[in-house]
Amino acid sequence: SIFLLSVLALMLLVSCSDLISAYLVIEMQALCFYILASFRRDSAFSTEAGLKYFISGAFISGIFLFGASLIYGGLGTLNFNNMSLLLSFPLENEFEHLKLFVLVGVLLVTITLLFKVAAAPFHFWSPDVYEGSPLSSTVIFSIIPKIVIFSFFIKWVSVIGLLFNDIKGFFVLIG
């Protein structure tokens, strides 16, 4: 049933249209994977893997929420359609400082998504978790969520594509 709940969360993530629903669905899937990572109760290794996964996931969730709050403070919305509409218009001079909030928020949300897929600079948690988890759980949460989060990441990049000139250095750095 935990696996089915995680599959439901992954299916919901593809259909998310704002950052708050994406956060809730990502956390629902992460909670299922925390349980699956520490599924072997008699193994201290498995318990350690689940705990490391939980602590690093809780930290990165706070970063996601902080980034989302900066985006909301700068744009006044978290809906993807409204965000792309607002980003398509140039900001007036008196609102230019809000662009910095939006840029930092976009970077924080992007870092969170890259952390969730264990991309290169943000992959420090994955070897320990994969090593200590049961093999069946490792196969599940090392492949399936990455595909779904990448599909969400494609949607996210299409929303923030208008800011790409301002943050392309970040993408070059992590690439």
Give names to the regions the model predicted.
Residues 1-175:
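Alpha-helical transmembrane segments of multi-pass membrane proteins predominantly involved
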